[in-house]
């Protein structure tokens, strides 16, 4: 199960945050704390980052978000905010939800449609880049 953290009053307009890869829903807290006096901020954490949980599918994550929103009485989202790979999940949410949404803000979404042949060519290079980052203990990023 996904974990959900909320800030603000449930009766205020709702903002739903989708976090980036490598962080939890709490990464949106600095912004949510600023907005909590006027908005009900919902910060889900993907099951990938929930201890003892197993990621099933994007559809399952969306189902969990929908169920949580319903349990909180959310009938309208003023804003959906998503960063990096979270934008991918947010886009899937947006295309399947029946909830009305006022605004959407994506920061660094990954929406490129890369063909199978190109992926096959690029995979070894990506693997090497990840290994290089591991071997350098992250020092490669500071150069």
Where are these regions (language model features)?
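Membrane-interface segments of envelope glycosyltransferases acting on lipid-linked substrates or membrane lipids
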Residues: 21, 40, 63, 105-119, ...
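Structural motif
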Residues: 13-14, 79, 103
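Active-site signature of alpha/beta-hydrolase-fold catalytic machinery across serine-
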Residues: 30, 92-96
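Flexible "cap/lid" loop of the alpha/beta hydrolase fold
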Residues: 95, 101-132
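Active-site loop/oxyanion-hole signature of alpha/beta-hydrolase fold enzymes
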Residues: 42-81
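Helix-loop "lid/cap" segments that line or gate small-molecule binding pockets
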Residues: 130-143
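Conserved HGGG/HGGXW glycine-rich cap/lid loop of the alpha/beta-hydrolase fold
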Residues: 5-51
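Gly/Ala-rich beta-loop-alpha elbow adjacent to hydrolase catalytic centers
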Residues: 81-90
